[in-house]
Amino acid sequence: MAHKPKKAACPSRAANRKKNTNSAHLEADISPWTEALFAAEILMLHATPVYYGFGVPRGDGSGVVIIPGFLGTDLYLMELHGWLQRIGYRSYFSGIGINAECPNLLVQRQLNQTIERALTETERKIHLIGHSLGGVIARSVAGQRPQDIASVITLAAPIRGTATSRTIRHAADAIRQRILREHGRGVLPDCYTGSCTCNFVDSLKRDIPRSMVETAIYTRDDGIVDWHYCMTGNREVDFEVPGTHIGMAFNPSAYAVVAERLARAQSSE
């Protein structure tokens, strides 16, 4: 069975932990080796009733756009896509290709087209689900298009900043240099950093309207990013599950939370 998700710790205590911890300590606390356990999460998912749609609220046919994480493609979200279809939603892959590009361009050139198609075909507001960097993108789009989004769900997404393993940081730096070389003046000088002044970064600072259901699912065993950054600080929004960062896309406990939160968004419309 899927583990019952736990609500986040008191926001004030989480904020104090974050305030008193420097970036060097944050990096030291991250252990990428635990991520090898994600394969067990896939096996566990297939052994749970949740995966087959039992014991979770049914969908209403509304559209759900799913967005892959850093260096990922829609392909690894096949399990999530199929599961959403089974429980009654119309699932859409993001169509962004490899998530290794300026996020602002990905949203403008690919993701917005997928969102428009989902809105047209379902004739109602849609839901966004993003894993890791895909969750940051989902949160940004929710800030840009609140009139079109019923709910936004982030899975192990560093929505409050980045503190990651050294390997991931080096990979991100290499991608940033490639983006600057390929696009030149087509992107801002601080592209692919939190200091960028593009619409993508700016929209992350906007508040989510109360009419939109927001959910941030995180794991304390995250071996890629510091889990504190995957929380909003709101106990009604943050949900802790056991598991790994990579495995969050296959995590039965996370799936159970997703189903409940999507159902809540239905009742809120």
Q: For each predicted feature, which ranges?
A:
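Flexible, membrane-associating and regulatory peripheral segments of lipid-active enzymes
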Residues: 1-65, 71-82, 87, 93, ...
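Serine-dependent carboxylesterase/thioesterase catalytic core
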Residues: 63-75, 79, 85-95, 99-203
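Phenylalanine-focused residue identity feature
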Residues: 38, 54, 70, 92-93, ...
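Short secondary-structure boundary micro-motifs
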Residues: 40, 48, 60, 136, ...
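Amphipathic, alpha-helical segments enriched in basic
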Residues: 42, 52-55, 59, 66, ...
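Generic hydrophobic, helix-prone segments enriched in Leu/Val/Ile
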Residues: 39-46, 111, 171-172, 227
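Helical cap/lid subdomain of alpha/beta-hydrolase-fold lipid enzymes
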Residues: 27, 143-269
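Detector for Asparagine
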Residues: 16, 20-22, 99, 104, ...
